[in-house]
Amino acid sequence: MRPTHRNVASAVAIGLSSLLLPATVIADAPEPSGSVTLTALGTYDGGGLARAEIVAFDARSARMAVSNDDLNRVDIVDISDPTSPTLVTSVDMSEHGDGVNGVAAHNGVFVAGVERDPSYDEATGVATADPGVAVFFDADGEISDVIGVGVLPDSVGFSPDGRKVVVAGEGEPLCATADLGGGEEEDIALATDPAGTIAVISLNEDGVPHGVADVLGFDAFDTEVLRASGVRIFWPGSDASNDLEPEYVTVSADSSTAYVTLQEANAIAVVNLDTPEITDVWALGTKDFSNLLMDASNRDGEINLENWDVRGIYMPDAVDNYTVNGVTYLVTANEGDSRDYDCYSEEERMADLDYTGSTLSAEILAATADDALLGRLNSTTAMPTSDPIDQLYMWGARSFTIWTTDGEVAYDPGSEFEEYIAEHYPNYFNANADDELPTAEEMIASMADEVDARSDDKGGEPEGLAVGRIGSRYYAFVALERQGGIMVYDITDPTNGQFEAYVNLALDEHAAGGDHSAPGTKDVSPEGVKFVSASDSPTSKPLVLVSNELSGTTTIYEVTGSEIDAELTASSVTLPATGSSPQLLVLASGLLAVGLAGLIARRRAA
């Protein structure tokens, strides 16, 4: 279909960009309510770049744990005073593996997923995968247990009751090595594809593992049935048991079920934790952008939001869940991810796809040949691309999505992320930080020279996510890995999310010419997000912890605003026990009514 332009370019430019693109004014661009935001209290610096990936929090000790893959350790940080986070100790994982990927905490027990490097045959260079481990330790960093899991443990999660730990074993393909370490061998026939796994570790009431993990695989699933349903199984020569790559874990409120993203497969796995067994795998489908807005090119020289008949493959990274009126919903950050190895790659620019026999319209085919339109947009030669091509696909959905637990979309904000940033952050729109620069401040400054650089790929790239309950309301906090910053949505109604705020202190500081000394102002590439409820918080106020991969910083935010104040006030009013005076009962009931009435009025006004 012909793109419909809904944007008007102007000469407005804010910030210190050396490459000034025109600001984009969207007639119906989303505007946040302004009643909820994030206030940075303090930032922990991991001691160098690339030293903060995933963050966890333990309410019992008021300590957070930050995975540091660069140094293969977990930093335990005291945040009893969030304005002054203090390193307690660093837990070295080198004795147990070669890289720490995920970390979780519950009731004084911490666990990290640690991968082990593969070995390579000296004659052929063929790789043999080595399963990783889950390392248990306490708030002082004392290691208690090391439990074997699957290959390449990634996300780690506790069940809410603390009796299970679930570990996603990604089991990524391994190309053979050329010259024993001199690079990847291009021959796909020499590659190996380890099994993807989900490990379930049972714990006693003190958080001590009972024994070995139940390492679950996908052998019971029929590969062709899954493919027919839309699950992307396509590594040459692999079936479901090897091809599926568990990425991120969330566990239901009743601790009975785990939901695990299978990012490259664009699917969700469902795990019965009581059995335990993987009971289902369902495909997520694609997102139609024909009536949404996106910039599809990094070569058009401007912010150019248009709608195209392109489908986004959700391919979520992080996932969380929440329950409303007894119904569980999943919330995903739709990053998108391709397989791109020396021995196999599915990546292709739309201009380079083979359109022989294609049923696409002449206008769309012409757009794919133009680098300023669709030609630069990254796509796939694998599923769901057909031969001949009848539909165009791109990585990710540039959004978050709320799903029912049978795979139906309940809510997605469409193109609101991209529309809002185009209008309010035009000098950093779809920017990319130069990760080869020596300081976080220089990386942030480089984004002003890299405007539009990610438009041909995944846009702002939503990757991290957490859901939190504050009073009677639920909020989603979504981290944009490339664009930076956190999107905040009220998702109390799972079918109708409300945009509350976008917080990007690093870009705000750069635009203002600041020195990046205040908390949160030198964060680059947010990866992990953790919500801390008011009841668990050392300040008795809800917090959001955000770990930033490139800058190596982790910032502690307080969730603030008029709506939050009203919710906390309403939820803190407790009616006196039976036998109290009628006057006190009337007073307490009145306070509760006033608080709720004020909250309702604010919501209606918004």
Predicted regions and their residues:
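Bacterial N-terminal signal peptides that target proteins for export
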Residues: 1-12, 582-584
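Short hydrophobic alpha-helical membrane-anchoring segments
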Residues: 18-26, 598-599, 603
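Beta-sheet-rich non-transmembrane sensory/scaffold domains
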Residues: 27-565
